[in-house]
Amino acid sequence: MELPPKVKNILLLDSEGKRVAVKYYSDDWPTNSAQEAFEKSVFTKTQKTNARTEVEVTALENNIVVYKFVQDLHFFVTGGEEENELILASVLEGLFDAVTLLLRSNVDKREALDNLDLIFLSFDEIIDGGIVLETDANVIAGKAGINSTDPNAPLSEQTISQALATAREHLTRSLMK
């Protein structure tokens, strides 16, 4: 029986290697200091590369790390050495594109910190207990709340539950007239 792909962590670091948002799904780094040491080694190994246009891949401490940079943010997804790097790359692209949608294409550290709740919701929509659930950025962003801010959006751009709520609201208004 083939096991589903597993992710060990998702890291979002700033341009100095400091945490913006991180989530670990593995006990490979049991303490906070072990996690920070891993984050530092990942950042140090990748900081001189140019991963601004394409996802890059590297091996570190028996792990595969895929990463991409934008402005002052560095996105990383880590899997075991047996994981398929294309799957890890699709997880990273899904995360990156979902964050871009959620932050309305203004992807930088300040905006990420202001919307940390949406970023962590994105993590939760992509991965559950290390198992990949979703990689489609539109689905991830939709579930994390991109459409909940505009109740006047066309029905075609709303989720089913949001569309039903809007229809119910319109029906209630028309009945009260």
UniProtKB/Swiss-Prot annotation:
Its main location: cytoplasm. GO terms for biological process: protein transport; retrograde vesicle-mediated transport, Golgi to endoplasmic reticulum. It is a peripheral membrane protein. SUPFAM superfamilies: SNARE-like (SSF64356). Keywords: Cytoplasm, Cytoplasmic vesicle, ER-Golgi transport, Golgi apparatus, Membrane, Protein transport, Transport. Transmembrane segments: none annotated. The keyword Cytoplasm applies. It is found in: Cytoplasm; Golgi apparatus membrane; Cytoplasmic vesicle, COPI-coated vesicle membrane. It holds the Pfam family Clat_adaptor_s. It comes from the Eukaryota. InterPro entries: AP_mu_sigma_su, Coatomer_zeta, Longin-like_dom_sf. One of its GO terms (cellular component) is Golgi membrane. Belongs to the adaptor complexes small subunit family. The coatomer is a cytosolic protein complex that binds to dilysine motifs and reversibly associates with Golgi non-clathrin-coated vesicles, which further mediate biosynthetic protein transport from the ER, via the Golgi up to the trans Golgi network. Coatomer complex is required for budding from Golgi membranes, and is essential for the retrograde Golgi-to-ER transport of dilysine-tagged proteins. The zeta subunit may be involved in regulating the coat assembly and, hence, the rate of biosynthetic protein transport due to its association-dissociation properties with the coatomer complex. Oligomeric complex that consists of at least the alpha, beta, beta', gamma, delta, epsilon and zeta subunits. This is Coatomer subunit zeta-1.
